[in-house]
A protein has these predicted regions:
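A short, conserved structural fragment
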Residues: 98-112
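Short, amphipathic alpha-helical interaction segments positioned at domain boundaries
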Residues: 119-149
């Protein structure tokens, strides 16, 4: 992970995920296929997605939580013209549920920001996944990207 997002990020390696000009691309996940495609002189991209507005908002939310362990919700509201508590009402409810990350001490939700705690660092991917709308719509039983432990 990185603390500051650049304008474009090209993925290198098996299963790498790149972010170029508003689109995500994931490299081949099998090593043999990755090298087969490279040897044929092509980029080893398995799939890609053009991001819509909601994707961009969620990407920023997830990236900032995972890379900075902190999310300035006021800044996000300003950047995207949203009211964070309304836009992410369902996600905030999941975070604050009786058996959710807040109750386990992984996350602190304060006015204007969300912070991953010291203990929460070990579970930051699990917390960030709450903001990933595609995980909810998955029906194949296979992970979309990588799994957490």
């Amino acid at each position: 992970y990185t603390v500051k997002m650049g304008s474009d990020m090209v993925a290198v390696g098996v299963s790498g995920i790149g972010d170029v000009r508003g689109a995500f691309a994931q490299n081949e996940k099998k090593l043999s296929r990755y090298y087969e495609v490279l040897d044929a002189g092509r980029f080893p991209v398995e799939r890609g997605y053009a991001l819509d507005r909601d994707d961009r908002i969620r990407r920023e939310t997830i990236t900032r939580l995972m890379c900075n362990l902190w999310l300035d919700t006021v800044a996000l509201e300003s950047e995207f013209g949203i009211v964070f508590a309304e836009y992410f009402a369902a996600e905030l409810a999941r975070l604050s549920a009786p058996d959710g990350p807040v109750s386990h001490g992984f996350v602190a939700i304060e006015a204007g920001h969300i912070e991953i705690t010291g203990l929460g660092r070990f579970f930051v991917r699990n917390v960030a996944m709450i903001f990933d709308r595609y995980l909810e719509s998955r029906t194949s039983g296979k992970p979309i990207f990588s799994r957490t432990v």
